[in-house]
Each structure stands twice: as C-alpha cells, then as structure tokens.
Amino acid sequence: ERVWQSLSRKPANLSELMRMIGETVYLNGHFLPLPEARISPLDRGFLFADGVYEVIPVYSRRPFRVEQHLERFDLSLKGIRLENPHAQDEWLEIVRHLTEAAPWPDQGVYLQVTRGEDNKRDHPFPAKVVPTVFGMTMPLITPPTEVLARGVSAVTAVDTRWARCDLKTTALLANVLLRQEGADAGHAETILLREGHLTEGTVSSVLIVQQGMLVAPPASQFILPGVTCE
C-alpha cells in the first residue's frame, strides 16, 4: 500500500502553479506577480546553492513561532558568512504581506537569501555583491486524520549529508536523493543514521516516545535545530 505523502506533483500549467504557490511573491524589495519574478542565471544560489532558507508555518493566518524561525534564519546566514539583508521587523512585514495576499488560512511561508549575482562563476565570495532575497507562500498540507491515527512507514539510510546540517542551506541534493530512496520503496520518509546514531529525517525532526518519555537526538552540527521541537 502506498502511504500518504505530502503533495509534490508538478503543476499542469502556470495558472495551477500560481494557485499552488500564490500569485504574489517577494523579490529584492518588491512584491510582484509570480510570472514577473526574474533571477539571474549567474546568481550564486543557482550556480553553487550558496544560500539559506526558512519555512514558517501559518495557522489561521497566524505565523507559528515566527520570531524563533527568523532567529534560526539569522543563525544560518551567519553560518555561511552572509549578512542578514533585513532587520526582524522588516522580515515580519514581508511575512505579513505574503500571508495576507494568499487565499489560504493555513500556509507555509518560504524565505530564501542567496549570496547574489556575480559577473562570473568563481568559488570565492565576490568582493561586492547584493544578496538575492525571495519569499513566497504555499498552502500548508497536513496529513489526513486516518494517517495521523495509524502513522506512516519509513526506511533508514546512512546519513551522507555534509557536516553542517545545523544550517538550513539550499544545498539539499543529499536530502533529495535519500528521501527518494524511501519514496521508491513506498515509504513516507527516510530516517538517517550517522555512524550508527540517529540524526533526523530528510525533511523532519525525530522524536521518540520511550518508557513514557519524549526523547530526541542531542543537538549537534549534524541536526537542524527544530523550532517546533523546542
């Protein structure tokens, strides 16, 4: 039996894409329709995955622990030596605008900052470059009631990601490949093990109920600190 998985199918056309993402996005200081958003092919986020992101869940149009999510966002930016382009109150205004412009009460607000557009492809940081700042929102997909009642299946795999998983970077190819291992076998998630120790799922934190207690792997550079878990 195929277990439930979050919606990830490709939209059939631009109109459907706009319904799935929202007609309004934020890009470099401007709110604009999705079809008008343009990013350079020389952007370091495109060439090197040189950027970080954050996802903020929104319930009934109220962002959940938004300050804590923005603090984690800032830590990720510091971790890749990229100055935060906005103060927290500016980020809050971006989140508010995106949330109010979208048709869904429950949403996932996606924020991303890359090191920006360079004039060539070269690994060292450019001397002067303006970060690319992007934001969008999507409907928040939650599991059906029957799935919450019976759970889902998962497979384990060796954690082959890099050594700074505590930073929420856009370099997610290892996560993509590892999760696909589970999807190919009909599982909802792939749980990762590093040297025999549980770290996390490819797209989830792991909490275990053991002898009446809620336990989790200890915080480390191999685990993204979960805002909800805190």
Task: Label each PLM-derived region with a short phrase.
Residues 2-190, 195, 220:
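Conserved alpha/beta cores of soluble small-molecule-handling proteins
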Residues 197-219, 225:
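Glycine- and Gly-Pro-enriched alpha-helical subdomains that act as flexible
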Residues 226-230:
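Feature captures the catalytic cores and cofactor-binding loops of soluble hydro-lyases/lyases
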